[in-house]
Swiss-Prot record:
InterPro entries: NA-bd_OB-fold (IPR012340), Ribosomal_uS12 (IPR006032), Ribosomal_uS12_bac (IPR005679). Residues 104-124 are annotated as: Disordered. HAMAP family: Ribosomal_uS12_B. GO terms for biological process: translation. GO terms for cellular component: small ribosomal subunit. It comes from the Bacteria. Belongs to the universal ribosomal protein uS12 family. The modification 3-methylthioaspartic acid is found at residue 89. This is Small ribosomal subunit protein uS12. The keyword Cytoplasm does not apply. Keywords: Methylation, Ribonucleoprotein, Ribosomal protein, RNA-binding, rRNA-binding, tRNA-binding.
């Protein structure tokens, strides 16, 4: 516990908060090219084959990103837009691919939460 005199002389040391998505380098999104498109199994209580892609970003950093939604059209050299945001049951995955931009198609037959999956408004 510092004395008041020490606080006047030195002040408090600020805590440095580290970024949650360091590969984006402070940008909201980054463009990248898919290097590998595979599946992964989630952590303990859950069971599935979650779709993931290894992406080389435009700044040269390679990250693993989650492909949200049902079904996708991504292949090895697809150009994608990556945003931050982790997937709770997939360890080490801190990025998501944005659907409906660049080479990524939106989710088909999506009625609710369409903007999150790049789906167009359905015809009446």
């Amino acid at each position: 516990m510092p004395t008041i005199n020490q606080l006047i002389r030195l002040g408090r040391e600020r805590k440095v908060e580290k970024p949650k998505a360091p590969a984006l380098q402070g940008n909201p999104q980054k463009r990248g090219v898919c290097v590998r498109v595979t599946t992964m199994t989630p952590k303990k209580p859950n069971s599935a084959l979650r779709k993931i892609a290894r992406v080389r970003l435009s700044n040269g950093i390679e990250v693993t990103a989650y492909i949200p939604g049902i079904g996708h059209n991504l292949q090895e050299h697809s150009v994608v837009l990556v945003r931050g945001g982790r997937v709770k049951d997939l360890p080490g995955i801190r990025y998501k691919i944005i659907r409906g931009t660049l080479d990524t198609a939106g989710v088909e037959n999506r009625k609710q939460s369409r903007s999150k999956y790049g789906a167009k408004r359905p015809k009446k």
